[in-house]
Amino acid sequence: MAMLSFEKKYRVRGGTLVGGDLFDFWVGPFYVGFFGVTTLFFSVLGTALIIWGASQGPTWNLWQISIAPPDLKYGLGVAPLMEGGLWQIITVCAIGAFVSWALREVEICRKLGMQYHVPIAFSFAILAYVTLVVIRPILMGAWGHGFPYGIFSHLDWVSNVGYQYLHFHYNPAHMLAITFFFTTTLAMSMHGGLILSAANPKKGEPMKTTDHEDTFFRDAVGYSIGSLGIHRLGLFLALSAAFWSAVCIVISGPFWTRGWPEWWGWWLNLPIWSQWPLK
């Protein structure tokens, strides 16, 4: 891929966290760096292990291939390779690849003199994954509480965990996570729609300005957060969705073992309701 006209001046030495100048180069448009190498290593190794694990299983059906975590009897120990050990190695590879990618983003930010909003945002996605496969299993005492790597098996795990707590939608942190996910979609779709509508006026008319965009929302809802503000809001909403999704699963089991509908008993016990006792 040809280098764009403005790219050359940004391809400068330095900004690396590890390795100095050894891996400080580009392949086409892609910056490599030490963490680019480790990302590639962990990604290739993890993918190869998944394919090898599938070859040892009963099917090549893409929907049914599954790499399961160890049985609960192994606790937090190292399991035999074909009894969950493969899942443990793949998990290490996944974390290694994700963290390496985030650190590679940090190096790119350092080269460009930018702040670290992008790698910080990606780190929240890493947090959600690590919560599922490391933090929660450790708190519950067994790697077997992690989710399997497979399409249908993963969906079965989600369903089973939900039913373990009777009705997972009553989990307050889950409510917050879903609210932030939906609100992110709403905010970003409205923002995207606004930009496209301003950038695509009727034939023969000039492109509209940020004043038009601000005025639209002032007319529509009485307030405009502004061009920079909508991106701050979008980042906050998206990070909140990832954060509360991690919270909702990590409190289920380690800190709350009953059905989530029972958690709302405090609401019924508020003094305000005492004049209407339950019968």
From Swiss-Prot:
Keywords: Bacteriochlorophyll, Cell inner membrane, Cell membrane, Chlorophyll, Chromophore, Electron transport, Herbicide resistance, Iron, Magnesium, Membrane, Metal-binding, Photosynthesis, Reaction center, Transmembrane, Transmembrane helix, Transport
Subcellular location: Cell inner membrane
Family matches, as SUPFAM superfamilies: Bacterial photosystem II reaction centre, L and M subunits (SSF81483)
InterPro entries assigned: Photo_II_D1/D2_sf (IPR036854), Photo_RC_L (IPR005871), Photo_RC_L/M (IPR000484), Photo_RC_L/M_CS (IPR055265)
Binding site for (7R,8Z)-bacteriochlorophyll b: 154, 174
PROSITE patterns to which the protein is assigned, alphabetical: REACTION_CENTER (PS00244)
Protein topology in the membrane: Multi-pass membrane protein
GO biological process, one term: photosynthetic electron transport in photosystem II
Transmembrane domains' residue ranges: 33-56, 85-113, 116-141, 171-200, 226-252
A GO molecular function held by the record: metal ion binding
Any one annotated GO CC term: plasma membrane light-harvesting complex
Family: Belongs to the reaction center PufL/M/PsbA/D family.
Stated role: The reaction center is a membrane-bound complex that mediates the initial photochemical event in the electron transfer process of photosynthesis.
Quaternary structure annotation from Swiss-Prot or TrEMBL: Reaction center is composed of four bacteriochlorophylls, two bacteriopheophytins, two ubiquinones, one iron, and three highly hydrophobic polypeptide chains (designated L, M, and H).
Protein name from the UniProt record: Reaction center protein L chain
Organism: Rubrivivax gelatinosus (strain NBRC 100245 / IL144)
Taxon lineage: Bacteria, Pseudomonadati, Pseudomonadota, Betaproteobacteria, Burkholderiales
Gene that encodes it: pufL
